[in-house]
Curated annotation (Swiss-Prot):
GO terms for cellular component: cytoplasm; nucleus. SUPFAM superfamilies: dsRNA-binding domain-like, P-loop containing nucleoside triphosphate hydrolases, PAZ domain, RNase III domain-like. The lineage of its organism: Eukaryota, Viridiplantae, Streptophyta, Embryophyta, Tracheophyta. Transmembrane segments: none annotated. ATP binds at L54, E55, T56, G57, S58, G59, K60, T61. GO terms for biological process: siRNA processing. SMART domains: DEXDc (SM00487), DSRM (SM00358), HELICc (SM00490), PAZ (SM00949), RIBOc (SM00535). It comes from Oryza sativa subsp. japonica. Pfam families: DEAD (PF00270), Dicer_dimer (PF03368), dsrm (PF00035), Helicase_C (PF00271), PAZ (PF02170), Ribonuclease_3 (PF00636). Probably involved in the RNA silencing pathway. May cleave double-stranded RNA to produce short 21-24 nucleotides (nt) RNAs which target the selective destruction of complementary RNAs. This is Endoribonuclease Dicer homolog 2a. Residues 1334-1400 form the DRBM domain.
Amino acid sequence: MGGPLTAAGGRGDGGAKAVEPLRPPPPPDPKTMARWYQLEALERAVRGNTLAFLETGSGKTLIAVMLLRAYAHRVRRPDSRRFAVFLVPTVVLVGQQARVVEQHTDLVVKQFCGEMGVDFWDAATWRSQLEDGEVLVMTPQILLDNLRHSFFRLQDIALLIFDECHHARGNTPYACIFKEFYHPQLNSSASDPLPRIFGMSASLIYSKDLNPHNYSKQISEIENLMNSKVYTVDSESALSEYIPFASTKIVDFDDSNISSELHANILSCLNRLNKKHIEALDRKLHGSSLENAKQRISKLHHTFVYCLYNLGVWLAAKAAEVQSYEENSLSFWGETLDKNVEGFIRNYSEEVHRELSCFLKNGHIGEKFPADSQDGILTPKVHCLIRTLLQYRHMQDLRCIVFVERVITSIVLEHLLSSIHQMSGWNVKHMAGSRPGLLSQSRKNHTEIVESFRKGKVHIIIATQILEEGLDVPSCNLVIRFDPSATVCSFIQSRGRARMENSDYLLLVGRGDVEAQTNAEKFLASGQIMREESLRLGSISCQPLENTLCEDTYYRVESTRAIVTLNSSVPLIHFFCSKLPSDEYFNPLPRFDIDKASGTCTLHLPKSSPVQTVNVEGEGSILKETVCLKACQELHAIGALTDSLLPELDVPCDEEPDIVVENKIEQPSYFPEEFVDNWRSFSRLGIYYCYKISLEGCPKTASPTDILLALKCDLGSDFTSSSFKLPGGQDNASVTMKYVGIIHLNQEQVIIARRFQTTILSFLIGDDHLEVSNGIKYFHEMQVPIGVVYLLLPLVSGRIDWCSMKFSSSPIYEANNKHMTHCHSCKDIDLLQTKDGPFCRCILKNSIVCTPHNNIFYVISGFLDLDANSCLPQHDGTVVTYKDYFKTRHGLTLTFENQPLLAGSKHVKVRNFLHNCYSKKEKEPGDRYSVELPPELCRIIMSPVSANNLHIFSYVPSIMFRIQCMLLSVKLKVQLGPTVQQFDVPVLKILEALTTKKCQEEFSQESLETLGDSFLKYVTTRHLFSEYRLQHEGILTKMKKNLISNAALCQLACSSNLVGYIHAEEFNPRDWIIPCLDYDERDNKKISFLAPNGMYSQRKMSIKSKRIADSVEALIGAYLSTAGEKAAFLLMKSLGMNIEFHTEIPVERKISMKAEEFINVRSLEGMLGYKFNDSLLLLEALTHGSYQTSGPTSCYQRLEFLGDAILDHLFTEYYYSKYPDCTPELLTDLRSASVNNNCYAHAAVKSGLNKHILHSSSELHRKMSYYLEEFGQSFTGPSYGWEAGIGLPKVLGDVIESIAGAIYLDSKCDKEVVWRSMKRLLEPLATPETIEPDPVKGLQEFCDRRSFKITYEKNHVDGVSSVIARVKAGETTYSATKSGPCKLVAKKLASKAVLKDLIAGHKDTEAAAV
């Protein structure tokens, strides 16, 4: 491997910044710092495929960088989207080499490694990643996988660099790239270009074969495989003037064993402990956990024996001590222990440590090294290592690496060297691979250790082969091979770490070990031999590899060119199985039955796989690969593998929503066309359709009045006779609306009616007297264009009150002292001075006036026996005249002192009478609102106007808004089409479904949404279960999510033009459009026509996508609750949902077997109260995925998927119909209390279903046994509420759902049959009286009301979770600690305890609210 660059071609700091979007100035040309052999290698690489074979530290990476610069113009050509790929064998090298390329080129560099989740990327994701990438640095498996899945092709790559190319051997990813793709294309007649190949390595030989006569063959093989020729120098001396070489020395030691007696005693002790703990496992564990634990204890036993022989008693004891650490839950060979095994492993290790410690003498290790070695405390090899290191105590700034073979050796040697007081000045660390394991180290840990090593804070690193290649390690002045190198490559690379001047490379060899000494001599000579052989082969051309892919060794998808080979078939099957549904008791894995004698192999896939068994015959050495290749073909044929040969992780493309809906979208809010017209044409119609609107249940007025609504058209049968409530009014106010026929009005009458309604409504709604009065004054000058046009005519005794309308709508300025003809009812003409001049008393009486000095409107009921000089009592008890009061308070001088004061009252503004939160205690107008007004301060707005008209017209905005929404609901019914329109769904029920909670009206969509949501899931689940019979539960769940997600439902609503019908905001009377009134553009009250869908709109609204999705669900619920399942289903179809609702779902059986051979069918049927026609459905419903033995061919997961939706819908429908008046919150709580896995699990145990489940999981067996033993008596009560079944294994609840699915299928989709059977198991059901609130929710609500702070502290020890709940209530802190099998259980228990204490400590609050 070539390292990062320095000015001399050596290593640098690698600290380059990320490439910016805009290219920075190009870095200096590396050629200016290159050595002669680097330039020579570059020239060779430009001309043809080249393998650079040069020593570690010679600057091979610089050659790669210069080659990338030479190819820069090819990866930047806009007409050819090609790129360069830099392959490195380890993840840590990805970032390291990427930084080097970024530092020395201006190319756009991208890094890829497995932890980025690339295994799950599809072709589109990769295309997006490649859009601007010019150099891709990655591990070889990623490139190989991409080529196999055909995400990109070899011809897309202009330059392909292989770091540490000696890994190109056998079936490694490096080799497979050439065998599966490069050579087949090289040998084909295709004209597609192949990438330029450049490899680099410090050793071309990567084998244990030290026979120099075989070097030529191995070099030729790698040249032919990579279709490249080797470049190297003729000897080390050619490089010695640029890089220093270490002095290699052999350090021998007396390789004698510990005394035979001590050896026998310790070995006997280890064997005894191994046997003891294996026998204990047989008594306490079962199934896979037992086998797992036995294997691990056996491996540990061999490890301790190895340490005893090779390291000594002290280090063997230290190995046992390290393995017994509580935080160490993983064995050091990298296999994860299941939770039930951890304790047994620790106990075994602890006892081994105690026993071995008895063989150790008292005293500090290292006080007498020769004696320790002689007594077997340390082996002579370890003693030699210590002695050798101590010889370098004089060295300043020691940088030493000790290479060992095993991870455990590195760990215990760190402990030993750190314990020796003679080495107290040196800091010792160990480094091992980053795979999961004992004291596992992450790449971050490695980087920190190497950085400390570079800074001199760490002096000695005990390392496995991880430091031979990969990490950018500073040059060392001492490298020791504690364990011999396994290969020539290992020897050369470890020696290459010693690159400081006068450095030493020491080999520890046992005295008399002739083989080791011979191997060391061969290792030393190997470098020169490889150079000579490479130069000798230089003139021989590479030979193409023939038949690297035989027809029966691969399977190719023709449409995509994706390929799976014998090499990749086994990993692909394992990857496929890993994506099948699993749980904490079962990991889906393939199982192989191989009979080498007969040359047959049977592959058993998990029961959730659509293909269960595959059989092949063939060559014994590749049977497993062959059967997996055949399985891949079969899985692809049925769609379980995509055309890219990856597990089907997502739904088919045609099921996915086309867009991702943003959180909020802007849509026009619709307006009913029945209320829209052109004023000119409306006023000349002559014939109008009339509806009588009566307000009932309001406080009685002098003479109750009604309103006549006159329209251009008939509103339809839904409005022939209808009624609705006004919850914001008093005394249960309601409105009835009845069609009364057609009337004829002339244009003058229409104008009078228009003036009246616009005047009175402007007054009731408006605030600015100038705006209102000017609007009335210049009314006759305005011409209303297209807008909201209809008439509201007051009725008296069933007749239109034209008299009131005519006079009250006449312009006031015409009734001054010059024109008194209108005062026909006045006996005496008596003028009073007003703000606008003198007016007759009759004009002022029953008028609406405004006082401009404070801009307040008043209703005048008559005259008072008071004038400006009358006394006005003040709040402080003093008395002033009205004249003085207005002068002092408002700065107004009253000049007409003798005029009587007017009896006025403030008019109550219109409000939202649809609001559900109106308080009956709200103040009503009365004496407290009475005022005395001097006429000269008043401006007359309207006269005369009756109190009755004012009263009923104050309700008009709310009434007409409700009618407006009802009209839109009728329009929606029509829009949904004739198939849906045939069902008689009340308009108000549709309106309920379209009204969000935010509107705060008497009804909202929440309950209907809950009902519709359950039906939507039920129907969708049925459809998917029936249509995709080969897909497992995981895929079906993803499909369902995509079909009915908020994004998908929002998309449907937008496509169906449904959004504009939604009532998403609280009604504000100020925003209501007064009919027949012209509005300015800036008022945002203009009506516009939406050409695409033929609707009218007033404005645009911003609405969350979830609210839109909720409305779709609520609409489904409305049709379901009033017209049945067929209506709801047809509604879904009309909205564009591509689903089917078959009356039956046929069950296919591939094999025949008797369920009675596995389960007690008769007993189960008695328990369920149902007799199965196909008892194999019951068998499937009780089969857990871990039951991999022969027999049932499927596990319960698909039935669980079906049954979950059925039960959810049955319970929701039951509670919705059982408690029709319950609040949405209560409906949700009832549903949540009954429809959850804990409740189902409780019912399963209560009924004894747990005894019939087929499984092979010892952990599941242990958990069920624990609960039955500890809490058996608690399984007799109800199966609802948060405490029922809490903590029970989820499998128990799953079985209830799967049995529901089985009965549903067996009964030909009869929900009633399922309900009777499930109700039998789950009774008694929750009721509003028995439901218990969730304690976590209850505690949160309690604290929110009082602004208390809640904190939770969670812990998990030995499989038991504990939670501490704390509440800070003022100066007092309440806390409770509870334990449980999981954090959720412990949290609920702790919350319950704290809540109980809080309620007791705050008795002044109503406990009911909790």
